[in-house]
């Protein structure tokens, strides 16, 4: 797991660092042109002051006709450190939880709760799209088939004498010899 996380973090740092041209050092020690320009050291001498392009090529800052050195930006550095801490913590938590579940499954400690373990019975659920909406469908008298077998007549509540065939005895009848 960490084998995937470390290259991903490295790629993130590389992409972020390539934006300002400082590489990975720009992530840990970002430079900025923000702040008061008068208390900074001049950069490039008179030629850089006369040519703003030369000033910027020297990776200096140019504002109001003054070419000056960049300063480390502590606010951006703090934000980068927090991003790095949260990313590493998330990767560590993910790795540990995967290892914990793998260990628990190998030791057969991980069990599904009882209400989730059984098969899914969809007959009790009500579908909003179904036409019947959970009502029990009972056959009407017109839709009952005419020829029913003996078992189905007994189940449907037929009387005791109705289901007998010729040659069978019922409890209340006696055979005449």
From Swiss-Prot:
Chief location category: membrane
Entry keyword set: Disulfide bond, Membrane, Signal, Transmembrane, Transmembrane helix
Domain of life: Eukaryota
Stored SUPFAM superfamilies: Trefoil
Cytoplasmic side, ranges: 103-177
Stretches the record annotates as Disordered: 131-177
Entry's localization field: Membrane
Compositionally biased spans, kind Acidic residues: 157-177
Transmembrane segments: 82-102
InterPro entries attached to this UniProt entry: P_trefoil_dom_sf, TMEM190
All residue ranges annotated as the P-type domain in the record: 31-71
Extracellular domain ranges by topology: 22-81
Disulphide-bonded residues: 33-61, 43-60, 55-67
Recorded GO CC terms: inner acrosomal membrane; nucleus
GO molecular function: identical protein binding
Membrane topology: Single-pass type I membrane protein
Signal peptide coordinates: 1-21
Keyword Transcription regulation listed: no
Gene Ontology process terms (BP): hematopoietic progenitor cell differentiation
Protein name per UniProt: Transmembrane protein 190
Upper taxonomic lineage: Eukaryota, Metazoa, Chordata, Craniata, Vertebrata
């Amino acid at each position: 797991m960490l084998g995937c996380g470390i290259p991903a973090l490295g790629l993130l740092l590389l992409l972020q660092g390539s934006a300002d041209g400082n590489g990975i050092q720009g992530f840990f020690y970002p430079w900025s042109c923000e702040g008061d320009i008068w208390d900074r050291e001049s950069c490039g001498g008179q030629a850089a002051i006369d040519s703003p392009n030369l000033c910027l090529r020297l990776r200096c800052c140019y504002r109001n006709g003054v070419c000056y050195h960049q300063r480390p930006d502590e606010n951006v550095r703090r934000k980068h450190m927090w991003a790095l801490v949260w990313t590493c913590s998330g990767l560590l938590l993910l790795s540990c939880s995967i290892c914990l579940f793998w260990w628990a499954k190998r030791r057969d400690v991980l069990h599904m709760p009882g209400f989730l373990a059984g098969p899914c019975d969809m007959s009790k659920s009500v579908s909003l799209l179904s036409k019947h909406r959970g009502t029990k469908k009972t056959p009407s008298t017109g839709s009952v088939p005419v020829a029913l077998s003996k078992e189905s007549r007994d189940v449907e509540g037929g009387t005791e004498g109705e289901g007998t065939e010729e040659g069978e005895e019922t409890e209340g009848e006696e055979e005449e010899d």
